Amino acid sequence: MDKQRVIDLLDQLSPILAGKEETIGKELTEKLQSALLVTKKDVASKDGVALATSLSGFVQTISNASLPGTNLRFTDQEGPVWEELKALTEQTREDGLRGLHLTI
């Protein structure tokens, strides 16, 4: 996985999330920004299954905030950042599981 690309995507996602405060509220915005910062630190310091778990947790947090009945929506311009981060996370998870199966 290209850790630098993931960090770049997280950096791009940060102002996108900050801009959603009016629609999703200050509390949820702060929660998502906090989760983003933790994930960014994890990307820099973790590898393998630990990294995949952290990224998956972050993607799940954002996905939950995007469920029907919530107000988090990405515009056509913002969507590609989110979609690429999800795709990289899925690939990392699959690679981590593949490595786990090889060691068992």
Each language-model region and where it sits:
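Amphipathic alpha-helical binding modules
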Residues: 62-104
